[in-house]
Amino acid sequence: MEVRPKESWNHADFVHCEDTESVPGKPSVNADEEVGGPQICRVCGDKATGYHFNVMTCEGCKGFFRRAMKRNARLRCPFRKGACEITRKTRRQCQACRLRKCLESGMKKEMIMSDEAVEERRALIKRKKSERTGTQPLGVQGLTEEQRMMIRELMDAQMKTFDTTFSHFKNFRLPGVLSSGCELPESLQAPSREEAAKWSQVRKDLCSLKVSLQLRGEDGSVWNYKPPADSGGKEIFSLLPHMADMSTYMFKGIISFAKVISYFRDLPIEDQISLLKGAAFELCQLRFNTVFNAETGTWECGRLSYCLEDTAGGFQQLLLEPMLKFHYMLKKLQLHEEEYVLMQAISLFSPDRPGVLQHRVVDQLQEQFAITLKSYIECNRPQPAHRFLFLKIMAMLTELRSINAQHTQRLLRIQDIHPFATPLMQELFGITGS
């Protein structure tokens, strides 16, 4: 079959054979459906599938042209100095002449869509196809009524128990010079080898977590606390009472949050206690992330601001301190409030916490919250950029679980040297003695 000259093309040919990538909004049509029978590729003579980048071509030449243009390849003819005949059999032998033939045929680089645009285009076509067939996936149809009620209950619990302005956090201790009553134990003034080893580990724990604090008064005054440069003695404990007060305030909110949730109240009291003991720290960090400013590396808790001091220098600190890295990575996901509360629920209802009796019930509840989170993401974030968001969130929860274990060990070591935990902290973390 001969190739029709360009002058013989009519308007109908162009309208009905446009390529998906070349003209947004109009699907490509198979060349066999054209009036007049099958068409051939203007580049190599193979069977054409439609208009691609302004020219009737086969799928092979379409893909070749896209790849060559995206690579900005500089091709040279190894045979006849740019005069190779391009056919179906020879098209793979000389890329330079094949590209020349594509351009001479009228294929246009500017009609190539970006990878992101192609993904969005495919998603749109898939969505429209689903609408026509009436077989939409759950995420597109929307959440079930049960899932919507579940999210509403969690959001209501969050609103009732978490004040992001921290206006009720008033009765707290501020760091200062420790009184004589807080001197180091006599055993550490002349420590044994065992006590010296404990002291060394505690210093390591605290020195890696130097926290600066800023308090803004209602009259506009500002009070700053900076950790001492040389933490060789008792001054490294100066901020512990304040941090214990803040932690206790947050833990009380977490307990109230859990008690508002009907699924939690339906569990035996023994399981409620076990779940709270295991998840309190994790839920606390998820709430802290909502007030974390990634640009300044600061937790903005109303009039109080906390910042981890950079003891390692530059970006290294981000790698050395898992807690800080976690907050940066989670904040980068730009989660909705609904996604935060669902994360809290998934963390709270973990069936493998020590002491949990009704493993199966708790496991089913956790699965329901996880499925609801996945459905919420599919419904509210259809863009291709968010297709892995659910997996990223679940990975962050796994990382938080690991940080929780490290935090508990660190807290117990510090408590052993310098008791500072409040009664509620002692109860949650299983601290039996002072």
From Swiss-Prot:
Keywords: Activator, DNA-binding, Metal-binding, Nucleus, Receptor, Transcription, Transcription regulation, Zinc, Zinc-finger. The keyword Transport does not apply. Hyperforin binds at S247, Q285, L286, R287, F288, H407. GO terms for molecular function: DNA-binding transcription activator activity, RNA polymerase II-specific; DNA-binding transcription factor activity, RNA polymerase II-specific; nuclear receptor activity; nuclear receptor binding; RNA polymerase II cis-regulatory region sequence-specific DNA binding; RNA polymerase II transcription regulatory region sequence-specific DNA binding; sequence-specific double-stranded DNA binding; zinc ion binding. Transmembrane segments: none annotated. Residues 146-433 form the NR LBD domain. InterPro entries: NHR-like_dom_sf, Nucl_hrmn_rcpt_lig-bd, Nuclear_hormone_rcpt_NR1, Nuclear_hrmn_rcpt, Znf_hrmn_rcpt, Znf_NHR/GATA. A zinc finger (NR C4-type) spans 41-61, 77-102. Changing P27S: In allele PXR*2. A motif (Bipartite nuclear localization signal) lies at residues 66-92. The keyword Metal-binding applies. GO terms for cellular component: chromatin; intermediate filament cytoskeleton; nuclear body; nucleoplasm; nucleus; transcription regulator complex. Belongs to the nuclear hormone receptor family. NR1 subfamily. Nuclear receptor that binds and is activated by variety of endogenous and xenobiotic compounds. Transcription factor that activates the transcription of multiple genes involved in the metabolism and secretion of potentially harmful xenobiotics, drugs and endogenous compounds. Activated by the antibiotic rifampicin and various plant metabolites, such as hyperforin, guggulipid, colupulone, and isoflavones. Response to specific ligands is species-specific. Activated by naturally occurring steroids, such as pregnenolone and progesterone. This is Nuclear receptor subfamily 1 group I member 2. It comes from Homo sapiens (Human).
